[in-house]
């Protein structure tokens, strides 16, 4: 294999390794964002359930329907 071909392959390898590292860091950052969004969603869901429970009339205490 010629020196030029080896140099070309080494250059491509360096760029590929850099791209892989960049993509890996992007995935790590996006996973952290996803974890944060999921935590916020769980909190909002819990708050919604609490609010609905406070507003719902107790069974048997519902006003009669009006016709």
Curated annotation (Swiss-Prot):
Pfam families noted in UniProt: SlyX (PF04102)
Disulfide bonds: none
InterPro entries noted in UniProt: SlyX
HAMAP family assigned to the protein according to its UniProt record, in alphabetical order: SlyX
Family matches, as PANTHER family: PROTEIN SLYX
Family, similarity comment: Belongs to the SlyX family.
Protein name per UniProt: Protein SlyX homolog
Naturally occurring in which organism (per UniProt): Thiobacillus denitrificans (strain ATCC 25259 / T1)
């Amino acid at each position: 294999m010629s020196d030029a071909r080896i140099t070309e392959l080494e250059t491509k390898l360096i760029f590929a390794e850099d791209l892989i590292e960049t993509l890996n860091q992007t995935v790590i950052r996006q996973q952290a964002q996803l974890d944060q969004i999921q935590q916020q969603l769980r909190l909002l869901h819990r708050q919604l359930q609490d609010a609905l429970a406070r507003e719902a009339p107790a069974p048997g205490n519902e006003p009669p329907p009006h016709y």
